[in-house]
Amino acid sequence: MAIERTLSIIKPDAVAKNVIGQIYSRFEGAGLKIVAARMTQLSRAEAEGFYAVHSARPFFKDLVDFMISGPVIIQVLEGENAIIKHRDLMGATDPKKADKGTIRADFADSIDANAVHGSDAEETAKVEIAYYFPALNVYSR
């Protein structure tokens, strides 16, 4: 079992629903530790930079507009197989297709307002974590 880190974002829709604590409980209940966290209002430039990989996709503008529509909570999760564990907790991108009991099935409204973001691979996680958290702001526990 590998100890990994992954980036997690609680998106504006879930922050507005006041389910941050419930989502954090799921992370911790699955054995994931929160080793860095902050609440922020993303600027357009931050959101465009973070999602630059999708810049040519038709949904890019709507995604950026959504991500800057309200505050988000950005955290780094650490634990055994953290990336896949976090993705399992999140559920499918489309909440209608997400398994019952996943974060998206329970808290998301649509494929766009889908409550959470999570890194999809180890290399992606490293890049995403570095984007929001300089190394000196992440603390192993």
Curated annotation (Swiss-Prot):
| Gene3D superfamilies attached to this UniProt entry | Nucleoside diphosphate kinase-like domain (3.30.70.141)
- Please provide, in alphabetical order, the Gene Ontology terms of the cellular component aspect for this entry: cytoplasm
- What Pfam families would the database entry show? NDK
**Which co-factors does it depend on?**
Mg(2+)
Give the enzyme's EC designation. 2.7.4.6
Main localization is cytoplasm
So where does ATP get bound? 11, 59, 87, 93, 104, 114
Subcellular localization, as worded in the UniProt entry: Cytoplasm
Listed A to Z, the keywords are: ATP-binding, Cytoplasm, Kinase, Magnesium, Metal-binding, Nucleotide metabolism, Nucleotide-binding, Phosphoprotein, Transferase
Catalytic residues, chain numbering = 117
Q: PANTHER family in the record, alphabetically?
A: NUCLEOSIDE DIPHOSPHATE KINASE, NUCLEOSIDE DIPHOSPHATE KINASE DDB_G0292928-RELATED
* Job of this protein: Major role in the synthesis of nucleoside triphosphates other than ATP. The ATP gamma phosphate is transferred to the NDP beta phosphate via a ping-pong mechanism, using a phosphorylated active-site intermediate.
Quickly give the catalysed reaction: a 2'-deoxyribonucleoside 5'-diphosphate + ATP = a 2'-deoxyribonucleoside 5'-triphosphate + ADP; a ribonucleoside 5'-diphosphate + ATP = a ribonucleoside 5'-triphosphate + ADP
Q: What's the protein called, per UniProt?
A: Nucleoside diphosphate kinase
GO terms (molecular function) for this protein are: ATP binding; metal ion binding; nucleoside diphosphate kinase activity
Q: Which GO terms describe its biological process?
A: CTP biosynthetic process; GTP biosynthetic process; UTP biosynthetic process
